[in-house]
Amino acid sequence: MDYNRMNSFLEYPLCNRGPSAYSAHSAPTSFPPSSAQAVDSYASEGRYGGGLSSPAFQQNSGYPAQQPPSTLGVPFPSSAPSGYAPAACSPSYGPSQYYPLGQSEGDGGYFHPSSYGAQLGGLSDGYGAGGAGPGPYPPQHPPYGNEQTASFAPAYADLLSEDKETPCPSEPNTPTARTFDWMKVKRNPPKTAKVSEPGLGSPSGLRTNFTTRQLTELEKEFHFNKYLSRARRVEIAATLELNETQVKIWFQNRRMKQKKREREEGRVPPAPPGCPKEAAGDASDQSTCTSPEASPSSVTS
Protein backbone atom coordinates (compact mmCIF):
# COMPACT_ATOMS: atom_id res chain seq x y z
CA MET A 1 0.00 0.00 0.00
CA ASP A 2 1.29 3.39 -0.98
CA TYR A 3 1.26 5.42 2.25
CA ASN A 4 3.02 8.37 0.71
CA ARG A 5 0.24 8.82 -1.80
CA MET A 6 -2.39 8.68 0.90
CA ASN A 7 -0.55 11.24 3.03
CA SER A 8 -0.28 13.60 0.08
CA PHE A 9 -4.02 13.31 -0.38
CA LEU A 10 -4.70 14.16 3.24
CA GLU A 11 -2.27 17.05 3.55
CA TYR A 12 -4.29 19.90 2.13
CA PRO A 13 -3.40 23.36 3.36
CA LEU A 14 -6.23 24.62 5.53
CA CYS A 15 -6.56 28.02 7.13
CA ASN A 16 -9.30 30.26 8.40
CA ARG A 17 -9.88 31.98 5.09
CA GLY A 18 -9.16 29.29 2.59
CA PRO A 19 -12.11 27.70 0.73
CA SER A 20 -11.41 24.08 1.38
CA ALA A 21 -13.22 21.01 2.69
CA TYR A 22 -12.33 18.70 5.51
CA SER A 23 -11.66 15.07 4.95
CA ALA A 24 -12.76 12.25 7.17
CA HIS A 25 -9.10 11.39 7.98
CA SER A 26 -7.73 14.89 8.47
CA ALA A 27 -4.96 15.18 11.00
CA PRO A 28 -4.70 18.25 13.24
CA THR A 29 -0.89 18.26 12.93
CA SER A 30 -1.07 19.17 9.24
CA PHE A 31 -2.80 22.56 9.80
CA PRO A 32 -0.59 25.60 9.55
CA PRO A 33 -0.93 28.38 12.10
CA SER A 34 -3.72 30.83 11.35
CA SER A 35 -2.87 34.43 10.58
CA ALA A 36 -6.11 35.76 12.21
CA GLN A 37 -6.50 36.35 15.91
CA ALA A 38 -7.71 33.31 17.78
CA VAL A 39 -11.29 33.88 18.92
CA ASP A 40 -14.21 31.68 19.65
CA SER A 41 -15.91 30.98 16.33
CA TYR A 42 -19.13 29.89 17.96
CA ALA A 43 -19.36 33.05 20.02
CA SER A 44 -18.84 35.18 16.90
CA GLU A 45 -21.74 33.52 15.15
CA GLY A 46 -24.09 34.80 17.86
CA ARG A 47 -26.03 31.52 17.93
CA TYR A 48 -24.42 30.00 21.01
CA GLY A 49 -24.35 31.92 24.28
CA GLY A 50 -25.92 35.09 22.82
CA GLY A 51 -22.74 36.24 21.08
CA LEU A 52 -20.65 36.37 24.24
CA SER A 53 -17.05 35.44 23.75
CA SER A 54 -15.22 33.60 26.48
CA PRO A 55 -11.96 35.14 27.66
CA ALA A 56 -10.38 31.72 27.69
CA PHE A 57 -10.84 31.33 23.94
CA GLN A 58 -9.64 34.84 23.11
CA GLN A 59 -6.15 34.19 24.39
CA ASN A 60 -3.54 33.24 21.84
CA SER A 61 -2.30 29.70 22.08
CA GLY A 62 -0.16 27.38 20.12
CA TYR A 63 -3.11 25.57 18.61
CA PRO A 64 -4.57 26.88 15.40
CA ALA A 65 -8.02 28.48 15.56
CA GLN A 66 -11.02 26.43 14.58
CA GLN A 67 -12.40 26.93 11.17
CA PRO A 68 -15.77 28.72 10.90
CA PRO A 69 -18.64 26.79 9.42
CA SER A 70 -18.49 28.97 6.33
CA THR A 71 -15.17 27.45 5.28
CA LEU A 72 -16.68 24.01 5.07
CA GLY A 73 -18.07 22.68 1.91
CA VAL A 74 -21.53 22.15 3.44
CA PRO A 75 -23.81 25.21 3.32
CA PHE A 76 -24.59 26.41 6.80
CA PRO A 77 -27.36 29.00 7.49
CA SER A 78 -26.27 32.03 9.42
CA SER A 79 -28.39 33.68 12.07
CA ALA A 80 -27.37 37.21 11.03
CA PRO A 81 -28.32 38.75 7.68
CA SER A 82 -25.68 39.04 5.01
CA GLY A 83 -23.50 42.10 5.32
CA TYR A 84 -24.19 42.59 9.04
CA ALA A 85 -22.34 41.51 12.07
CA PRO A 86 -23.97 39.17 14.57
CA ALA A 87 -25.65 40.54 17.68
CA ALA A 88 -23.27 41.67 20.35
CA CYS A 89 -24.27 41.58 23.99
CA SER A 90 -23.23 44.24 26.46
CA PRO A 91 -24.65 45.27 29.85
CA SER A 92 -25.17 48.87 28.66
CA TYR A 93 -27.18 48.00 25.54
CA GLY A 94 -30.72 46.91 24.95
CA PRO A 95 -31.93 44.45 22.31
CA SER A 96 -29.65 42.80 19.79
CA GLN A 97 -28.55 45.11 17.00
CA TYR A 98 -26.72 44.46 13.75
CA TYR A 99 -23.91 46.66 12.58
CA PRO A 100 -22.57 46.68 9.02
CA LEU A 101 -19.12 45.35 8.44
CA GLY A 102 -16.40 47.65 7.28
CA GLN A 103 -15.23 45.06 4.78
CA SER A 104 -15.77 41.40 4.12
CA GLU A 105 -13.00 39.39 5.68
CA GLY A 106 -14.38 35.95 5.05
CA ASP A 107 -16.57 33.94 2.82
CA GLY A 108 -19.35 33.51 5.42
CA GLY A 109 -19.17 36.79 7.28
CA TYR A 110 -16.34 35.74 9.63
CA PHE A 111 -14.64 38.94 10.74
CA HIS A 112 -12.16 40.22 13.20
CA PRO A 113 -13.54 41.81 16.38
CA SER A 114 -11.63 45.00 15.70
CA SER A 115 -13.69 45.67 12.54
CA TYR A 116 -16.72 46.81 14.48
CA GLY A 117 -15.24 47.84 17.81
CA ALA A 118 -14.74 51.40 16.62
CA GLN A 119 -18.30 51.60 15.33
CA LEU A 120 -19.75 50.45 18.63
CA GLY A 121 -17.62 52.92 20.53
CA GLY A 122 -19.32 55.83 18.78
CA LEU A 123 -22.72 54.83 20.14
CA SER A 124 -21.75 55.13 23.80
CA ASP A 125 -22.74 58.80 23.86
CA GLY A 126 -26.42 58.08 23.34
CA TYR A 127 -26.75 55.17 25.77
CA GLY A 128 -24.21 55.70 28.54
CA ALA A 129 -24.31 57.72 31.75
CA GLY A 130 -28.00 57.14 32.29
CA GLY A 131 -29.16 59.23 29.34
CA ALA A 132 -27.01 62.24 30.22
CA GLY A 133 -25.60 62.52 26.68
CA PRO A 134 -27.39 63.44 23.46
CA GLY A 135 -29.44 60.26 23.27
CA PRO A 136 -32.94 59.54 22.08
CA TYR A 137 -34.41 60.35 25.51
CA PRO A 138 -35.37 63.98 26.16
CA PRO A 139 -33.94 65.70 29.23
CA GLN A 140 -36.05 65.75 32.34
CA HIS A 141 -38.12 68.82 32.99
CA PRO A 142 -37.12 70.83 36.04
CA PRO A 143 -39.60 70.90 38.89
CA TYR A 144 -42.11 73.71 39.06
CA GLY A 145 -40.81 76.69 40.92
CA ASN A 146 -41.64 80.30 41.41
CA GLU A 147 -40.97 81.03 37.74
CA GLN A 148 -43.68 78.67 36.52
CA THR A 149 -46.25 79.64 39.11
CA ALA A 150 -45.70 83.32 38.47
CA SER A 151 -46.92 82.89 34.89
CA PHE A 152 -50.31 81.70 36.15
CA ALA A 153 -50.78 84.58 38.57
CA PRO A 154 -52.52 86.95 36.08
CA ALA A 155 -55.08 84.29 35.13
CA TYR A 156 -55.87 83.53 38.76
CA ALA A 157 -56.10 87.23 39.56
CA ASP A 158 -58.71 87.70 36.83
CA LEU A 159 -60.80 84.83 38.17
CA LEU A 160 -60.65 86.17 41.69
CA SER A 161 -61.62 89.64 40.54
CA GLU A 162 -64.71 88.24 38.83
CA ASP A 163 -65.76 86.50 42.02
CA LYS A 164 -65.30 89.65 44.07
CA GLU A 165 -67.39 91.86 41.82
CA THR A 166 -70.04 93.89 43.52
CA PRO A 167 -73.47 92.30 43.46
CA CYS A 168 -76.12 93.62 41.18
CA PRO A 169 -77.74 96.81 42.44
CA SER A 170 -81.02 96.27 44.13
CA GLU A 171 -84.07 96.99 42.11
CA PRO A 172 -85.97 100.20 42.84
CA ASN A 173 -88.48 99.93 45.61
CA THR A 174 -91.54 98.30 44.19
CA PRO A 175 -94.89 99.21 45.63
CA THR A 176 -95.83 96.76 48.35
CA ALA A 177 -98.82 94.52 47.96
CA ARG A 178 -102.15 95.82 49.05
CA THR A 179 -102.68 95.47 52.78
CA PHE A 180 -106.15 94.42 53.86
CA ASP A 181 -107.77 95.28 57.13
CA TRP A 182 -107.70 91.71 58.33
CA MET A 183 -103.91 91.68 57.88
CA LYS A 184 -103.45 94.56 60.37
CA VAL A 185 -104.76 92.59 63.32
CA LYS A 186 -102.27 92.33 66.16
CA ARG A 187 -101.65 88.79 67.31
CA ASN A 188 -99.85 87.58 70.37
CA PRO A 189 -97.22 84.87 69.87
CA PRO A 190 -98.60 81.43 70.68
CA LYS A 191 -97.72 80.02 74.05
CA THR A 192 -96.39 76.53 74.40
CA ALA A 193 -98.82 74.29 76.21
CA LYS A 194 -97.48 72.02 78.91
CA VAL A 195 -98.55 68.46 78.34
CA SER A 196 -99.83 66.97 81.58
CA GLU A 197 -99.06 63.46 82.63
CA PRO A 198 -101.53 60.77 81.63
CA GLY A 199 -104.47 60.63 84.03
CA LEU A 200 -103.83 64.09 85.51
CA GLY A 201 -105.98 66.94 84.28
CA SER A 202 -108.43 67.00 81.43
CA PRO A 203 -107.45 67.10 77.77
CA SER A 204 -109.62 70.21 77.36
CA GLY A 205 -107.03 72.19 79.29
CA LEU A 206 -104.56 71.88 76.39
CA ARG A 207 -104.24 74.95 74.21
CA THR A 208 -104.15 74.60 70.45
CA ASN A 209 -101.19 76.28 68.78
CA PHE A 210 -102.19 77.48 65.33
CA THR A 211 -99.64 77.97 62.62
CA THR A 212 -99.18 81.25 60.79
CA ARG A 213 -100.96 79.92 57.75
CA GLN A 214 -103.93 78.76 59.80
CA LEU A 215 -104.19 82.07 61.66
CA THR A 216 -104.00 84.03 58.43
CA GLU A 217 -106.83 82.07 56.86
CA LEU A 218 -108.97 82.32 60.00
CA GLU A 219 -108.44 86.09 60.24
CA LYS A 220 -109.33 86.47 56.58
CA GLU A 221 -112.54 84.53 57.06
CA PHE A 222 -113.42 86.48 60.22
CA HIS A 223 -113.02 89.77 58.34
CA PHE A 224 -115.80 88.80 55.93
CA ASN A 225 -117.98 86.61 58.15
CA LYS A 226 -117.97 86.98 61.92
CA TYR A 227 -120.42 84.10 62.26
CA LEU A 228 -120.00 80.87 60.37
CA SER A 229 -122.60 78.36 59.33
CA ARG A 230 -122.14 74.69 60.01
CA ALA A 231 -121.23 73.87 56.41
CA ARG A 232 -118.70 76.72 56.16
CA ARG A 233 -117.13 75.75 59.47
CA VAL A 234 -116.64 72.16 58.31
CA GLU A 235 -115.14 73.35 55.03
CA ILE A 236 -112.59 75.62 56.74
CA ALA A 237 -111.67 72.89 59.20
CA ALA A 238 -110.97 70.47 56.36
CA THR A 239 -108.91 73.05 54.47
CA LEU A 240 -106.74 74.01 57.45
CA GLU A 241 -106.41 70.44 58.76
CA LEU A 242 -108.32 71.28 61.94
CA ASN A 243 -111.46 69.88 63.48
CA GLU A 244 -114.79 71.65 63.64
CA THR A 245 -114.59 72.36 67.37
CA GLN A 246 -111.23 74.16 67.04
CA VAL A 247 -112.61 76.44 64.32
CA LYS A 248 -115.78 77.18 66.35
CA ILE A 249 -113.86 78.03 69.54
CA TRP A 250 -111.42 80.24 67.66
CA PHE A 251 -114.28 82.27 66.19
CA GLN A 252 -115.93 82.63 69.62
CA ASN A 253 -112.69 83.91 71.14
CA ARG A 254 -112.09 86.19 68.20
CA ARG A 255 -115.54 87.83 68.59
CA MET A 256 -114.96 88.37 72.31
CA LYS A 257 -111.60 90.00 71.63
CA GLN A 258 -113.11 92.25 68.99
CA LYS A 259 -115.86 93.47 71.38
CA LYS A 260 -113.31 94.10 74.12
CA ARG A 261 -111.26 96.31 71.83
CA GLU A 262 -114.34 98.25 70.77
CA ARG A 263 -115.34 98.90 74.39
CA GLU A 264 -111.87 100.14 75.24
CA GLU A 265 -112.03 102.56 72.34
CA GLY A 266 -115.56 103.75 73.32
CA ARG A 267 -117.17 102.72 70.08
CA VAL A 268 -119.56 100.14 71.48
CA PRO A 269 -123.16 101.46 71.47
CA PRO A 270 -125.13 100.89 74.67
CA ALA A 271 -127.10 97.71 74.62
CA PRO A 272 -130.90 98.18 74.55
CA PRO A 273 -132.80 96.95 77.59
CA GLY A 274 -134.02 93.39 77.46
CA CYS A 275 -131.47 92.28 74.82
CA PRO A 276 -129.05 89.49 75.66
CA LYS A 277 -125.33 90.12 75.52
CA GLU A 278 -124.83 87.68 72.71
CA ALA A 279 -126.46 88.09 69.38
CA ALA A 280 -128.62 85.56 67.72
CA GLY A 281 -125.63 84.13 65.87
CA ASP A 282 -123.84 83.53 69.12
CA ALA A 283 -126.84 81.70 70.46
CA SER A 284 -126.70 79.38 67.51
CA ASP A 285 -123.05 78.68 68.22
CA GLN A 286 -123.76 78.01 71.87
CA SER A 287 -126.47 75.56 70.96
CA THR A 288 -124.05 73.60 68.84
CA CYS A 289 -121.35 73.46 71.50
CA THR A 290 -122.99 70.52 73.19
CA SER A 291 -123.22 68.57 69.96
CA PRO A 292 -120.71 65.77 69.50
CA GLU A 293 -117.52 66.65 67.69
CA ALA A 294 -117.78 66.02 63.99
CA SER A 295 -114.76 65.19 61.91
CA PRO A 296 -114.34 66.65 58.42
CA SER A 297 -114.27 63.21 56.82
CA SER A 298 -117.62 62.22 58.31
CA VAL A 299 -119.26 65.49 57.30
CA THR A 300 -117.99 65.56 53.75
CA SER A 301 -118.93 61.93 53.18
From Swiss-Prot:
Gene3D superfamilies xref list: Homeodomain-like
Domain of life of the organism encoding this protein: Eukaryota
UniProtKB keywords: Developmental protein, Disease variant, DNA-binding, Homeobox, Nucleus, Transcription, Transcription regulation
GO molecular function: DNA binding; DNA-binding transcription activator activity, RNA polymerase II-specific; DNA-binding transcription factor activity, RNA polymerase II-specific; protein domain specific binding; RNA polymerase II cis-regulatory region sequence-specific DNA binding; RNA polymerase II transcription regulatory region sequence-specific DNA binding; sequence-specific double-stranded DNA binding
Main location: nucleus
DNA-binding region per UniProt: 203-262
A Gene Ontology cellular-component term: nucleoplasm
Pfam families assigned: Homeodomain
InterPro entries on file: HD, HD_metazoa, Homeobox_CS, Homeodomain-like_sf, HXA1/B1/D1
Region (Disordered): 20-77, 127-149, 254-301
Membrane-traversing stretches: none
One GO BP: anterior/posterior pattern specification
Record motif Antp-type hexapeptide, residues: 179-184
Compositional bias per record (Polar residues), positions renumbered to this chain: 26-38, 55-70, 284-301
Function: Sequence-specific transcription factor which is part of a developmental regulatory system that provides cells with specific positional identities on the anterior-posterior axis. Acts on the anterior body structures.
Disorder this protein is connected to according to its UniProt record: Facial paresis, hereditary congenital, 3: A form of facial paresis, a disease characterized by isolated dysfunction of the facial nerve (CN VII). HCFP3 patients are affected by bilateral facial palsy, facial muscle weakness of muscles innervated by CN VII, hearing loss, and strabismus.
Family of the protein in this entry: Belongs to the Antp homeobox family. Labial subfamily.
Name of this chain's protein: Homeobox protein Hox-B1
Organism: Homo sapiens
